[in-house]
């Protein structure tokens, strides 16, 4: 008689890196929204369609967009109410483009460069 072939398809999640990159991209493009005139004071699923861009020049958000109501606090300045110490006086890495880099960590205030010469015994043999 005959033979049959079975194909099995498996659904697979993308890698963690892929998901993280997508979320970061959406986070960078997030826009602030306000309730439109049609909305109520409390957010429900039905009210989400009444969210409008804070800036009328921006296009309305799509269901895939990230939106926010409140601005983040200024983490550059100390704020005891929020519990942040600010970044003034922190050491930074002048050559880094990361979170420890002076451009980001000093929040555009500028920074002082400290050059330090250290002499140590190296226990070298020649």
UniProtKB/Swiss-Prot annotation:
Disulphide connectivity of cysteines: 92-107
One GO-annotated biological process of the protein: neuron differentiation
Keyword Disulfide bond among UniProt keywords: yes
Protein keywords: Developmental protein, Disulfide bond, Extracellular matrix, Glycoprotein, Lipoprotein, Secreted, Wnt signaling pathway
One Gene Ontology cellular component annotation held by this UniProt entry: extracellular space
Keyword Acetylation: no
Lipid-linked residues (O-palmitoleoyl serine): 1
Record note on modification: Palmitoleoylation is required for efficient binding to frizzled receptors. Palmitoleoylation is necessary for proper trafficking to cell surface. Depalmitoleoylated by NOTUM, leading to inhibit Wnt signaling pathway.
Any one GO MF annotation of this record: frizzled binding
UniProt subcellular location: Secreted, Extracellular space, Extracellular matrix; Secreted
Domain of life: Eukaryota
Family annotation (InterPro entries): Wnt (IPR005817), Wnt1 (IPR009139), Wnt_C (IPR043158)
Glycan-linked positions: 93-94
Family: Belongs to the Wnt family.
Function: Ligand for members of the frizzled family of seven transmembrane receptors. Probable developmental protein.
Protein name: Protein Wnt-1
Organismal lineage: Eukaryota, Metazoa, Chordata, Craniata, Vertebrata
